Amino acid sequence: MNIRTILVEKAIAAMTTVGLPADTNPAVTQSTRPQFGDYQINAAMGAAKKMKSNPRELAQKIIDNLDVSDIAEKTEIAGPGFINIHLKPEFLAQSVKAANSDAKLAVNEHANPQKVVVDYSSPNLAKEMHVGHLRSTIIGDAIVRALEFRGDSVVRQNHMGDWGTQFGMLIAHLEDQISQGVDLDTVALADLETFYRDAKKRFDDEEGFADKARNYVVKLQGGDAHCEKLWKLFIATSVKHSEEVYKRLNVTLTQADIMAESAYNAELNDIISLLKDKNIAVESQGAQVVFLDELANKDGEPSAFIVQKSGGGFLYATTDLAACDYRSNKLGADRILIFVDARQSLHFNQVELTARKAGFLRDETSYEFCPFGTMMGADNKPFKTRTGGTVKLADLLEESINRAAIKLAERESDLSEQERSEIARKVGIGAVKYADLSKHRTSDYIFNWDSMLSFEGATAPYLQYAYTRIRSIFRKSGVDAATLNSNVTIVEPQEKALALKLLQLEEVLDLMITEATPHVLCGYLYELASLYMTFYEACPVLKEGVEPNVRDSRLVLCNLVSKTLETGLDLLGIEVMEQM
């Protein structure tokens, strides 16, 4: 159900009857305060200005032709021409009952499902994932889950960095170990980070090692079988590390979703040939460059986008163009979403402009670069270890689980050690994810253990606790939530506020999907839980003296809140528990 969409359709019909232009935006919004109704139609002011008429008079004409008697108990004009819509409690009650009986909580699937390619996580292989990979991984996964929930066909693409000069460096270091008698089948790559660091130190400091590494890159790119065997060893080890992190994070990416850089190797020569044939790329100092006037600097100099090095080597740019061609022309994507650090904005602007010119992106394909900000430490600098090193993502998650266990140990509980451990895992992982996802995607944010693990405020532990409180009501009542289908009555203002919020889930998901911003769902779930707490204090459910029909009506509201929290948190990749 989408109340806003219903009102938009009714408002357009009324405005058409009044004679407003067909492209007039009805400007339907949720009201910010109950005294302004539940929704507002704000079209009259802008339309009246264009038509040089009185906005209140125009608003009255719209109301006179607005057929909302089935859902609204009152419409009124406020201020310069706002139309306030007060929804019928009966309409809300019937809609809540229907949503409670529906597996998808009355959230409709898209009328015209799209094929959406989502490029997310995409770590560089050869070393372990670090905290810098968190945002792309969990933001992208939340959007993927929401798209699938609404019925879109989603193609996950984990564009892992599995090619490039770093592999020549690693192969050279490994070859030296093998030459010293280390058995390739037993070589210790468990600590990839240490292996990479040792190889990098040799690359930077040891005479002759860098040349050796570059020679191995040439061999690898030339298809040398031995180099390829060693390369695959690094890839397999890296992928295994990544998969362990994905499982810990409760992320839906699997090995089948990997579409790494090397997957496009066979296409890169053709990409360059086409760019040259169409005079899109030209030679400059031996390299192939696309000059983009659309991104010219303040002096009018076009942006230079290098697609092939002077020595003939390919770059990220070449691979990204090949990925555009594959996703748009071969997969037939309607949308391509790419979740990458905001610092790569220029690069992806260059990619899209070049791909459009070359035909690698069809006009019908929406190419959406979805940048995100940085996780910062208390010093307002990118999050690091105390010694200034990179924080491994696996270590961060483990610490969060341990901290959650300590917090939970402070609470009285008769749960077993195994149950406590499982709850700590869900709380710890959920806390990290919600703390990140609840911030606007493009914003930097400061990482803070105390706030994210708090059981108060906008946190995962607070929402998880709210869910467990509702489940405990059903255990106490003896009512089977799965078969509960009582009639709902909306009398108290707290009941109405809660019912209205419950019925706005689809609107929230629409915004989240359109703008690729999970924080709107996070905010909605917190508002819902807060309204539930207010409702529960004001509207007794199981207290003595509550009429059975009132009790059952309120139990339906409680049940739908719990299902909405569970569904919403699941869309964020956060697990709930029956007890805490």
Curated annotation (Swiss-Prot):
CDD domains with a match to the protein in the record: Anticodon_Ia_Arg, ArgRS_core
GO CC list: cytoplasm
Pfam families: Arg_tRNA_synt_N (PF03485), DALR_1 (PF05746), tRNA-synt_1d (PF00750)
EC number annotated for this UniProt entry: 6.1.1.19
Keywords, in A-Z order: Aminoacyl-tRNA synthetase, ATP-binding, Cytoplasm, Ligase, Nucleotide-binding, Protein biosynthesis
SUPFAM superfamilies: Anticodon-binding domain of a subclass of class I aminoacyl-tRNA synthetases (SSF47323), Arginyl-tRNA synthetase (ArgRS), N-terminal 'additional' domain (SSF55190), Nucleotidylyl transferase (SSF52374)
Location in the cell: Cytoplasm
BP-aspect Gene Ontology terms: arginyl-tRNA aminoacylation
InterPro entries linked: aa-tRNA-synth_I_CS (IPR001412), Arg-tRNA-ligase (IPR001278), Arg-tRNA-synth_N (IPR005148), Arg-tRNA-synth_N_sf (IPR036695), ArgRS_core (IPR035684), DALR_anticod-bd (IPR008909), Rossmann-like_a/b/a_fold (IPR014729), tRNAsynth_Ia_anticodon-bd (IPR009080)
Top enzyme class: ligase
Example of a GO MF term: arginine-tRNA ligase activity
Motif ('HIGH' region): 123-133
Keyword flag Kinase: no
Catalysed reaction, written as an equation: tRNA(Arg) + L-arginine + ATP = L-arginyl-tRNA(Arg) + AMP + diphosphate
HAMAP family documented for this protein: Arg_tRNA_synth (MF_00123)
PANTHER family attached to this UniProt entry: ARGININE--TRNA LIGASE, CYTOPLASMIC, ARGINYL-TRNA SYNTHETASE
Protein family per UniProt: Belongs to the class-I aminoacyl-tRNA synthetase family.
UniProt subunit comment: Monomer.
Protein name (record): Arginine--tRNA ligase
Gene that this polypeptide is encoded by: argS
